[in-house]
Amino acid sequence: MAVNTQPIIRLTNVTKSYGEHQVLKNINLDLEAGKFYTLLGPSGCGKTTILRTIAGFTDATSGQVYFDGQVINTLPANQRQVNTVFQDYALFPHMNVAENVAFGLKLHKVPKDEIETRVQKALAMVQLADLGEREISEISGGQQQRVAIARALVMQPKVLLLDEPLSALDAKLRKDMQYELRDLQQRLGITFLFVTHDQEEALAMSDEIFVMNAGEILQGGSPVDIYDEPINHFVANFIGESNIIPGKMLKDFEVEFVGKQFECADAGMQPNEAVEVVLRPEDLDIVAANQGKLVVTVDSQLFRGNYFEIVAYDTDHNEWLVHSTNPAAEGEPIGLTFDPQDIHVMRLNESEAAFDARLEQYEDD
Ligand SMILES: Nc1ncnc2c1ncn2[C@@H]1O[C@H](COP(=O)(O)OP(=O)(O)OP(=O)(O)O)[C@@H](O)[C@H]1O
């Protein structure tokens, strides 16, 4: 039997403009059924606009939005099999918890006893089975957040859109909810599209992350791929902490930076092509100055609980961030070592679109 690989949601060449301001530029996105996806990017990059376009609250200026293979650009929001959990929860303050969850079902004229069963089940899913009769003003922020999720899940959507649903919670509750949401998604097996500007949250929760900036998706991939192989300076900087150092690709598997040559794992660039080299702070080991592949001078350090964050400078005045379990002496030189596969070489100003364009040109030749 053929496996259905059609994406549940597909966006092709979607743009959105408000007057002169283009807030989405040629968005292409495929979401498979049953996976946890995250849109990650800074404030104002267009994450919410993508969610609203999928939900049917905003019309795309151009391009197509598909649900299960059908174009849904003109389908009203209430007829889409998609529900949204909003950042501010948007609960009805004059209704109790159960009434809030029941609201959408009543609107769809679902029979009363079915409503009761489904509401109870949805409340149990988010561990609020006993709080149905409480007023919204009588529950905590974290519980309100769960009501908002229950209210969306009770509609049995195929896709759940979550717009920064954890941003109002304190750090501890936020971590707990990350686990719970991930667990819920896996148990229900529906597609989640989650929006955040918190890279740690995105890395912890997602099957796949789309990193956005200024209305564009710069890179999509698994958390490990995006962390280990950032496509450009922006992604490297946005996902985790990085040392990004200017360099030159001498030939395949050989790169130069800070005036020295290093073996690396990258290939396929022009000889002597100008590049940027990414080295993660946790991939650098400190050794005696005369044994290092590079020598840097320690400027300052902070104790971060399970490691020391050390700031140092090389002779070209590049700043180096190093994570070490041992402290270093400020003002003193230290040696840094790293493995060839810890060096990640990036082309300058690389984006997936630019890469794809190059590939197409290559295929046409
Ligand atoms: N109705 C509107 N009219 C004009 N501009 C809008 C409108 N809605 C959004 N924008 C603009 O579109 C851009 C993208 O907004 P969007 O809300 O999608 O960003 P975001 O990535 O979700 O940001 P945040 O993380 O702050 O919520 C912003 O510059 C915003 O000001």
From Swiss-Prot:
<dbReference type="GO" id="GO:0043190">
    <property type="term" value="C:ATP-binding cassette (ABC) transporter complex"/>
</dbReference>
<dbReference type="GO" id="GO:0015594">
    <property type="term" value="F:ABC-type putrescine transporter activity"/>
</dbReference>
<keyword id="KW-0067">ATP-binding</keyword>
<keyword id="KW-0472">Membrane</keyword>
<feature type="domain" description="ABC transporter">
    <location>
        <begin position="9"/>
        <end position="239"/>
    </location>
</feature>
<feature type="binding site">
    <location>
        <begin position="41"/>
        <end position="48"/>
    </location>
    <ligand>
        <name>ATP</name>
    </ligand>
</feature>
<dbReference type="InterPro" id="IPR017871">
    <property type="entry name" value="ABC_transporter-like_CS"/>
</dbReference>
<keyword id="KW-0547">Nucleotide-binding</keyword>
<dbReference type="InterPro" id="IPR027417">
    <property type="entry name" value="P-loop_NTPase"/>
</dbReference>
<dbReference type="InterPro" id="IPR050093">
    <property type="entry name" value="ABC_SmlMolc_Importer"/>
</dbReference>
<dbReference type="GO" id="GO:0005524">
    <property type="term" value="F:ATP binding"/>
</dbReference>
<dbReference type="GO" id="GO:0016887">
    <property type="term" value="F:ATP hydrolysis activity"/>
</dbReference>
<keyword id="KW-1278">Translocase</keyword>
<dbReference type="Pfam" id="PF08402">
    <property type="entry name" value="TOBE_2"/>
</dbReference>
<dbReference type="InterPro" id="IPR003439">
    <property type="entry name" value="ABC_transporter-like_ATP-bd"/>
</dbReference>
<dbReference type="InterPro" id="IPR013611">
    <property type="entry name" value="Transp-assoc_OB_typ2"/>
</dbReference>
<dbReference type="InterPro" id="IPR003593">
    <property type="entry name" value="AAA+_ATPase"/>
</dbReference>
<comment type="function">
    <text>Part of the ABC transporter complex PotABCD involved in spermidine/putrescine import. Responsible for energy coupling to the transport system.</text>
</comment>
<dbReference type="InterPro" id="IPR005893">
    <property type="entry name" value="PotA-like"/>
</dbReference>
<keyword id="KW-1003">Cell membrane</keyword>
<protein>
    <recommendedName>
        <fullName>Spermidine/putrescine import ATP-binding protein PotA</fullName>
        <ecNumber>7.6.2.11</ecNumber>
    </recommendedName>
</protein>
<keyword id="KW-0813">Transport</keyword>
<comment type="subunit">
    <text>The complex is composed of two ATP-binding proteins (PotA), two transmembrane proteins (PotB and PotC) and a solute-binding protein (PotD).</text>
</comment>
<dbReference type="InterPro" id="IPR017879">
    <property type="entry name" value="PotA_ATP-bd"/>
</dbReference>
<dbReference type="Pfam" id="PF00005">
    <property type="entry name" value="ABC_tran"/>
</dbReference>
<dbReference type="InterPro" id="IPR008995">
    <property type="entry name" value="Mo/tungstate-bd_C_term_dom"/>
</dbReference>
<comment type="similarity">
    <text>Belongs to the ABC transporter superfamily. Spermidine/putrescine importer (TC 3.A.1.11.1) family.</text>
</comment>
